[in-house]
């Protein structure tokens, strides 16, 4: 589907297909944008998640001189998102001339802020974790996807250390957690004999997948584990990581949720088989492949999302985010750098900014994300750091 005009404002009709039930609902959203040449409207389709998301391509533009409004980022409370924020904010500030800020918080409230326009950009929208809210935001015309964030990630609710499975080689499935001898491995003094699961934090999309949301009762209930598992909210991503690291250091049993690629999973040897993902029903066995109905997480599709008001205010940012390419190599390198320098700064935000500057100085991968004029602005700024 193509649209063309000659430097005039046109009504751009975007058709959103939302697969939120057995039928596909088509919603038309009208948005006025300035288009300078013929561009294509593409749809990114994820078969496993069954969410169609349209991406509008824009001509690569350079902002005009003059005052520009502040761009507000969603400060999701985990490292990969905050590092991406820091890199993107530096480019937007030094390259495009916008002041930036971020509102920190968890997935659910920050996405509501994005829909309302309190937040302009969120660097990590995890699907299927946020399927319901995402589909509603797209359907209402409040948000659009403008690029791919991380590479496709994995996540699982039921991970155990390989050293536990080596001691109990027949423990290889969530069904085994229904047996007294296996759930006793992960029981704690206050869990009444149930296996303790260190799960997803309150306010994160994955929490609803595990314990239930508007779409379903959650993995624990639908896998028949309610009488066998005691769910524990670690409170923060840092506390979850500390619990996992502590168990591995002591060679203690632990049943936990996590995701990757991340520095923690790399350090603990996930790629080398030192972490076991207990067998679960395949995503294809669940309605709409949604894990909330009692199956494993499919591969996560992670999007960069923009509030639609920013289309008018800063259309030149859309090509930048469409070209964003935060590979696993970039991610793990930056997370490692952050871990090394975090204690040297007075605040986490300062440490994330220093991590971003280090990445931008040492890597040239990002040069292709921006026009030459913007690249020149950023290069000058980096030389002053």
Model-derived features: where do they sit?
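Bacterial signal peptide processing site
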Residues: 21-23
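Ligand-binding pocket segment of bilobal, Venus flytrap-like solute-binding proteins
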Residues: 113, 119-123, 197-283
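Short, well-ordered beta-strand elements
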Residues: 57, 66-80, 98-103, 194-198, ...
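C-terminal motif of bacterial Sec signal peptides marking the signal peptidase cleavage site
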Residues: 16-19
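A conserved helix-loop-strand patch within extracytoplasmic ligand-binding domains
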Residues: 142-200
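Immediate post-signal peptide segment of exported/extracytoplasmic ligand-binding proteins
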Residues: 54-73, 186-194, 367-370, 378-385
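A bilobed periplasmic-binding-protein/Venus flytrap-type ligand-binding module shared by bacterial periplasmic
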Residues: 155-167, 300-313, 336-338
């Amino acid at each position: 589907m193509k649209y063309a005009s000659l430097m005039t404002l046109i009504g751009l009709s975007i058709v959103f297909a939302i697969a939120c039930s057995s039928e596909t609902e088509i919603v038309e959203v009208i948005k006025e944008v300035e288009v300078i040449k013929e561009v294509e409207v593409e749809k990114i389709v994820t078969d496993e998640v069954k969410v169609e998301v349209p991406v509008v391509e824009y001509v690569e533009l350079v902002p005009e001189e003059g005052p520009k409004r502040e761009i507000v980022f969603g400060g999701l409370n985990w490292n990969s998102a905050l590092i991406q924020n820091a890199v993107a904010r530096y480019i937007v500030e030094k390259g495009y001339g916008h002041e930036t800020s971020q509102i920190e918080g968890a997935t659910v409230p920050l996405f509501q802020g994005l829909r309302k326009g309190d937040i302009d950009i969120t660097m990590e929208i995890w699907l299927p974790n946020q399927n319901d809210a995402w589909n509603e935001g797209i359907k209402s015309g409040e948000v659009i996807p403008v690029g791919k964030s991380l590479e496709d990630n994995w996540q699982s609710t039921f991970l155990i250390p390989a050293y536990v499975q080596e001691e109990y080689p027949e423990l290889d499935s969530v069904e085994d957690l229904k047996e007294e001898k296996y759930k006793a491995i992960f029981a704690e003094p206050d869990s009444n004999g149930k296996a303790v699961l260190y799960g997803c934090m309150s306010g994160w999309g994955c929490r609803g997948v595990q314990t239930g949301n508007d779409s379903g009762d959650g993995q624990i209930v639908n896998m028949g584990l309610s009488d066998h598992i005691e769910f524990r909210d670690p409170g923060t991503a840092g506390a979850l990581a500390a619990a996992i690291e502590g168990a591995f250091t002591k060679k203690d049993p632990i049943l936990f949720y996590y995701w990757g690629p991340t520095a923690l999973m790399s350090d603990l040897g996930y790629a080398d088989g030192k972490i076991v993902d207990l067998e679960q029903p395949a995503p294809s066995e669940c309605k709409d492949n949604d894990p909330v109905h009692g199956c494993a997480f499919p591969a996560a599709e992670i999007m960069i999302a923009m509030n639609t008001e920013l289309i008018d205010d800063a259309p030149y940012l859309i090509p930048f985010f469409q070209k964003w390419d935060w590979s696993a190599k970039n991610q793990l390198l930056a997370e490692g750098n952050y871990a090394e320098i975090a204690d040297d700064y007075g605040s986490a935000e300062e440490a994330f900014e220093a991590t971003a500057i280090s990445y931008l100085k040492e890597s040239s991968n990002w040069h292709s994300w921006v026009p030459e004029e913007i690249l020149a602005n950023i290069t000058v700024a980096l030389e002053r750091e």
